[in-house]
């Protein structure tokens, strides 16, 4: 089984100040802005060859989310064969947070925690879906 880091995700209260910070400090390039179904803004930035995801915090009136906190939210680990990777990790003793799901056709996700509580996202993203979203610049994929 082969794995690689796909992205790191950071939750922020003021997403635009974070975008500005990473652009000014690290010459980050915005590759995608989106607002998924729950209405929170998400911005993907490219820094060199790597991807950074900034996620806006929800409002205090929203229901509590067990994954909701400021700072590094999760590390996305890419799996070429999602089903095989999910089975492999379960066999190795991984405890998943909920069941795998597909938030958008072509994107498969599952969350688990490492022993100290950090959240890991197992992800398989159809490159064609992501490239199409990037080409549009603002997509709900």
Could you tell me what each predicted segment is?
Residues 1-17, 72-77, 126-141:
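N-terminal beta-strand motif that seeds the catalytic metal site of vicinal oxygen chelate
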Residues 2, 10-52:
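Core segments of cupin and vicinal oxygen chelate
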Residues 4, 39-41, 71, 106:
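Exposed loop/turn and edge beta-strand positions of beta-sandwich/beta-sheet ligand-binding modules
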Residues 9, 29-36, 101-103, 124-130:
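Conserved catalytic-core motifs of GNAT/GCN5-like acyltransferases
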Residues 12-16, 69-119:
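Vicinal oxygen chelate
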Residues 31, 39, 59-65, 98, ...:
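A short, acidic/glycine-rich surface segment
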Residues 45-48, 112-115, 125:
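Active-site beta-strand termini and strand-to-loop segments that position acidic
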